[in-house]
């Protein structure tokens, strides 16, 4: 894979007295990734079940990320020399009975920076301003071994679908779904006070009626437990060091009427 390089609108410069060096430059390098994937697909239980398993590995060179410079308000894109990601994905579906279908999707990911590289955490550097660039620079950290940004360690989507035909000739479909998203770090800094995005799990349910006259009526319940899960977060790298939080939608109850023609 390939992502082109580019130029930053804001970037740093080295101090004339040598007290600090630029960490965000006028240009940034292209990002490349070497990927490998091995998979297997298998049907069994007389064709009523199927499993797909994939194992993958990604090696990144010059991974692009949002970086902070010792000079205030000079954030931009920088490159991490080497990083890697590996994992496994499992898909499974089975017709348990004539009326019940079971579906499961699981994902496991491990990621890390695999080379020495120093970054500056804007959350820590924000306490210092113009004239204190050397103090900001002294806060830089080596992120070798840190998790890559926004790569959940575990994801799961499991559902059970029940379908039947009623005595009236209309059909009924019920779906019960469980979704889990594991925790991740929202920046490569891995600052536990702002970067850790915790896991969450939700339950969804729906009941649908398909009538013989091409009308359909669905009752839908999303996030049944009203879980206040955190979907993601983002910390500004350009100066104010503010962190914005994005939550998953609250409990939603919906009715949908549709007509096929």
Label each PLM-derived region with a short phrase.
Residues 29-31, 41, 54-56, 81, ...:
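Surface-exposed loop and edge beta-strand positions of immunoglobulin-like domains
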Residues 21-27, 74-79, 85-87, 141-147, ...:
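Extracellular loop and loop/strand-boundary signature of outer-membrane beta-barrel proteins
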Residues 46-51, 99-102, 167-172, 213-217, ...:
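Repeated loop/turn-to-beta-strand initiation elements of outer-membrane beta-barrel proteins
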Residues 32-36, 84-86, 150-156, 199-203, ...:
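Residues that define the transmembrane beta-barrel architecture of outer-membrane proteins
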Residues 179-189, 209-261:
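C-terminal beta-signal and adjacent terminal beta-strands/loops
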Residues 1-37, 47-51, 55-80, 117-119, ...:
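Surface-exposed extracellular loop regions of Gram-negative outer-membrane beta-barrel proteins
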Residues 39-43, 91-94, 105, 161-163, ...:
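Transmembrane beta-barrel domains of outer membrane proteins
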Residues 57-59, 78-188, 260:
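Gram-negative outer-membrane beta-barrel transporters
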């Amino acid at each position: 894979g390939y992502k082109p390089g580019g130029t930053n609108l804001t970037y740093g410069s080295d101090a004339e007295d040598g007290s600090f060096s630029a960490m965000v430059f006028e240009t940034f390098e292209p990002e490349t990734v070497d990927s490998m994937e091995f998979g297997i697909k298998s049907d069994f239980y007389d064709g009523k079940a199927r499993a797909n398993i994939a194992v993958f590995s990604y090696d990144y060179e010059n991974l692009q990320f949002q970086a902070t410079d010792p000079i205030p308000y000079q954030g931009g894109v920088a490159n991490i020399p080497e990083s890697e990601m590996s994992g496994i994905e499992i898909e499974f579906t089975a017709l348990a009975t004539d009326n019940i279908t079971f579906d499961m999707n699981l994902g496991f990911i491990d990621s890390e920076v695999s080379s020495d590289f120093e970054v500056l955490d804007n959350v820590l550097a924000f306490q210092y301003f113009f004239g204190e660039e050397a103090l900001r620079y002294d806060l830089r950290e080596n992120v070798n071994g840190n998790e890559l940004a926004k790569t959940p360690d575990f994801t799961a989507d499991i559902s059970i679908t029940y379908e039947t035909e009623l005595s009236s000739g209309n059909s009924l479909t019920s779906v019960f779904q469980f979704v889990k998203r594991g925790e991740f770090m929202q920046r490569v800094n891995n600052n536990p006070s702002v970067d850790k995005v915790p896991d969450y799990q939700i339950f969804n349910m729906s009941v649908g009626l398909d009538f013989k006259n091409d009308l359909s009526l669905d009752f839908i319940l999303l996030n049944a437990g009203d879980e206040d899960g955190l979907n993601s977060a983002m910390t500004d790298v350009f100066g104010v060091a503010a962190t914005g939080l994005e939550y998953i939608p609250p409990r939603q109850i919906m009715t949908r009427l549709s007509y096929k023609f």
